[in-house]
Amino acid sequence: MKTNKNISAIAIMKKKQSIDKEGARLIRALIIISIIGLLAMFTNKASAQVRFNVQGDLVSSYVWRGMYQTGASIQPTLSFSVENLSLTAWGSTDFDGYRNGNIPSANKELDLTLAYTFPKLGLTVSVADMWWAGQGAGKYFDFNNKTTAHHFEASLAYVLPVEKFPLSIAWYTMFAGMDKNEKGDKNNYSSYVELNYPFSVKSVDLNVTCGIVPYKAPQYYTNGFAVTNVALKGSYAIKITDSFSLPIFSQVIWNPRMEDAHIVFGITLKQ
């Protein structure tokens, strides 16, 4: 005969499984709704201008939000947009591959981002699916909130309506997926806030970045408020011919929280 404690434990386990299943259903629903929304845009506004963007960056190292990820990498981008709605696929992979026999060791990432911009308000809202399990990890299509290797993140970005002071601020929060607490039963809701200020000096485009973590977030190795990303980026296009220029960039990055610093060089190829 089952005791009340056993019955309670079984009930709790079933409840957790139900929650995990609901989380997986929610994520699948978001993906389906996004696809349907894009198809509806094409169907209802066939005459709307569709814009595609294809490009790739070759970088000396991959640093994400002030944190070193891996060495030299290729980072391709494929995106398309209809009016103010866009869908972007961005990825990164280094050159490690299967260097240790059959053991996969490459750093591999694929991020999918659905975004909508409100031009008159200067606002952009987006939802991203970030997957960086690496080469050979498999289970890409595991969307169970308890076992998935995906990180799902929502963001809100705002650009000040001041032409001479185009400061932007963005807030990112992971709301589902692998961003879990130590027990693995609750989301951490790790958040990151970033300010960017672009400007130009002669023919060089510059951008100053300051990124902070507002509260405890193991994802960023913080126990509370911390500055994790201070950077200065410079971009310049080298003229090769009258019809072709090669964009290059360098970025100096400091992470006060980790007491670390990086410098990255990159080349961009785009249509």
Can you annotate each of these PLM segments?
Residues V54-Y62, L85-F95, T124-A133, Y140, ...:
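Transmembrane beta-strand segments that form the barrel wall of outer-membrane beta-barrel proteins
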Residues M1-R51:
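Cleavable N-terminal export/targeting peptides
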Residues T70-M130, L195-L206:
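Glycine- and aromatic-enriched membrane insertion/assembly motifs of diderm outer-membrane
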Residues A46-R51, N84, P119-T124, P161-P166, ...:
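Short loop/turn motifs that connect adjacent beta-strands in outer-membrane beta-barrel proteins
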Residues V63-Q69, Y98-P104, G136-T147, M174-K186, ...:
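Outer-membrane beta-barrel domain signature
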Residues F143-P218:
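Detector for outer-membrane/organellar transmembrane beta-barrel domains
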Residues L232, I238, E259-Q271:
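Outer-membrane beta-barrel "beta-signal"
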Residues V50-F52, T70-I74, A106-L110, T148-A154, ...:
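Residues that define the transmembrane beta-barrel architecture of outer-membrane proteins
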